[in-house]
């Protein structure tokens, strides 16, 4: 019953006789010797029939035999795994004559390209860049811009509020107010930045980019504003576009206008809003509207980018799809 040397030798020969070099074959032998009905399991169960004096010595011999067989199994498994690995590596050999993989080079995001184009154009005309906080107060986002509490224009902004006084800015116009508070006319600034509104569809996202212009001087007038925007739009789109100004309404400008360009399909396309700075806005920052006047321009960067590159869904700019972004390198 306890011819352990014979059992060990039989196991060794069975392992050595395996030809297919598969782990499944080794597993079958392991089960034959170590499974619930295996040889060594039966031997261990038979210890209950051995006298108490002999049981420790017999048990030790059985364990020694088990360890020998297990070591043979483990060694054979390692050997076969190494053979399988070498065969797989030989099949996966690298052909050094093949061309290497090209490194993907990064590029500017189309929104960044548009911002740079706008800033570059107006910088040549003496406009400087000013920035402001994205978490804005009710005063700078609305009150100082001639949009008091309960004004119906507030309902159009779909504002993200933190509390009664703080919000995510819905426009970069607050930068204009902060600039006029700290600078004396003449003032020529651009205010690019992120703005936030609770809206999401094919032409709107909760976060988007605006660029606003502000020009304040003693002789600022609407004719000058029209000429400036004509030149800008033709330079930006690199075409001799038809441009029209439609009367509109903004609380912070008077008179106000929407600016359209003629599309290739023969339809007018809205591109930006503008107007003469409202006298109340100038008074709110301590500038005498009887002495100074100014004009302001607001443009959505994503909208300009969509029109320039014929993009139909604004959300494409924020989905990080490399197939889309590669087109703008």
Swiss-Prot record:
The keyword Magnesium applies. SUPFAM superfamilies: Class II aaRS and biotin synthetases, tRNA-binding arm. Pfam families: Phe_tRNA-synt_N, tRNA-synt_2d. Binds 2 magnesium ions per tetramer. It is found in: Cytoplasm. Its cofactor is Mg(2+). Its main location: cytoplasm. InterPro entries: aa-tRNA-synth_II, aa-tRNA-synth_II/BPL/LPL, Phe-tRNA-synth_IIc_asu, Phe-tRNA_ligase_II_N, Phe_tRNA_ligase_alpha1_bac, Phenylalanyl-tRNA_Synthase, tRNA-bd_arm. It catalyses: tRNA(Phe) + L-phenylalanine + ATP = L-phenylalanyl-tRNA(Phe) + AMP + diphosphate + H(+). Belongs to the class-II aminoacyl-tRNA synthetase family. Phe-tRNA synthetase alpha subunit type 1 subfamily. This is Phenylalanine--tRNA ligase alpha subunit. It comes from Histophilus somni (strain 2336). The gene is pheS.
């Amino acid at each position: 019953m306890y011819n352990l040397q014979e059992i060990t030798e039989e196991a060794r020969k069975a392992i050595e006789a395996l030809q297919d070099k598969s782990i499944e074959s080794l597993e079958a032998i392991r089960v034959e010797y170590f499974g619930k009905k295996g040889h060594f399991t039966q031997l261990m169960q038979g210890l209950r029939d051995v006298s108490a004096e002999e049981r420790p010595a017999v048990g030790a011999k059985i364990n020694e035999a088990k360890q020998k067989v297990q070591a043979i199994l483990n060694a054979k498994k390692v050997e076969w795994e190494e053979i399988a690995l070498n065969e797989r590596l030989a099949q996966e050999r690298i052909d050094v004559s093949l061309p290497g993989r090209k490194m993907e080079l990064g590029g500017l995001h189309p929104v960044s390209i548009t911002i740079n184009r706008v800033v570059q154009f107006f910088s040549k005309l003496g406009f400087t860049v000013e920035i402001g906080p994205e978490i804005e107060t009710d005063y700078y986002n609305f009150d100082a811009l001639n949009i008091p509490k309960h004004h119906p224009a507030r309902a159009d902004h779909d504002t993200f509020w933190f509390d009664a006084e703080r919000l995510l800015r819905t426009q970069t116009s607050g930068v204009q107010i902060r600039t006029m508070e700290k600078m004396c006319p003449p003032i020529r600034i651009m205010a690019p930045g992120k703005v936030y509104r609770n809206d999401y569809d094919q032409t709107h996202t909760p976060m988007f980019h605006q660029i606003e212009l502000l020009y304040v001087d003693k002789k600022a007038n609407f004719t000058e504003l029209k000429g400036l925007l004509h030149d800008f739009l033709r330079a930006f789109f690199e075409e001799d576009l038809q441009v029209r100004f439609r009367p509109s309404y903004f609380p912070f400008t008077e008179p106000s206008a929407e600016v359209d360009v003629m599309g290739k399909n023969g339809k007018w396309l809205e591109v930006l809003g503008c107007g003469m700075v409202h006298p109340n806005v100038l008074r709110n920052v301590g500038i005498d509207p009887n002495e100074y006047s100014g004009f302001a321009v607001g443009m959505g960067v994503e909208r300009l980018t969509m029109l320039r590159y014929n993009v139909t869904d604004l959300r494409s700019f924020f989905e990080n799809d490399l197939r889309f972004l590669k087109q703008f390198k």
